[in-house]
Amino acid sequence: MNALLALWLPILLSAVVVFVISSLVHMVFKWHNSEYHGFTNEDAVRAAIRAGNAAPGQYVLPYSKDMKEMGGEAMGKKYAEGPIGFVTLAANGPMNMGRSLGLWFLYCLFVTVVAAFLASQLFGLDHGHARAAGKLVGAVSFIAYGFGKIADSIWMGHPCSRLTR
């Protein structure tokens, strides 16, 4: 714990740098915009979802309540005719960017604290190990930020091209 307190400034600066760079990537350079698509009949899709009174949450098409139903003939037909999809519905109203950005910064801070903790446990605060500690912090951070979407590509059909961005 003392090592983390000694590293408070690098931890905070690292979280701020990641936050600022990620904000630039998403809001200024719009790196991921090409990954999102709209429906040609968006108004009809929105009306259908509203008609179902769906609460905020995650939904899957086609839906089955268990593996037995998923393996049934009716479900096989639904899969064959499509569409197959995963939908996340948020609460109605404008997006609260302040809250989202605040939570994103807290996540950046959390990743940095975990990486610093691991490095301090392995190498202490000895300046002779700074290069090795930096490599470890970089690897842990890369895994935390970069590998989280692999499961989405495997299970939810997100394009694998997202993994390289």
Where does each model-flagged region fall?
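Juxtamembrane/disordered regions of integral membrane proteins
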Residues: M1-R165
